[in-house]
Amino acid sequence: MDAASLALMAKDMTPTPVEIPGATGGRFLIQLLNEDADRGVVTSIIHLPAGGHIPAHLHRAGSEMHYVLDGDLIDAGREFGPGGFLTHAAGTTHGPHESRGGARVLTVQHWQSRDGKFDFHLTGKAAAPPPGGTAAAGLPPDPTAPNLGTGDAEAPTG
């Protein structure tokens, strides 16, 4: 297999702790399947603990997709079980995410981190799009620009 390809078995990867700004209710874990955007979309499995809560947030650099592998995921009050699918355009406030009994969620993003910084920005209420455009239109073009006071996420810890 060449350097532009990747093949692995997720079940063989040990989940590692990940710090998610504002998250409460237990220890969140991640299996980072592909972080190299040159090889394709950034792909991970997020393990939400029973009672886990991730506050409303957005991603500036690209869209994000969630597919519930097992357990329960609650997104802004709407419940999803295995097979549940959600997707959000860049700059779209989504969440809060919660799980009553725990969940494993396949997450696919166009871009996730650079220099150890995740593209994760806490928000308050769902932001309305600026006049004449989408929510992403009013965002800074550089996803690595500091977002002071909003709790940019840290890299996975292990």
Where do the PLM segments sit?
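An anionic, turn-rich surface loop/hairpin at beta-sheet edges
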Residues: F85
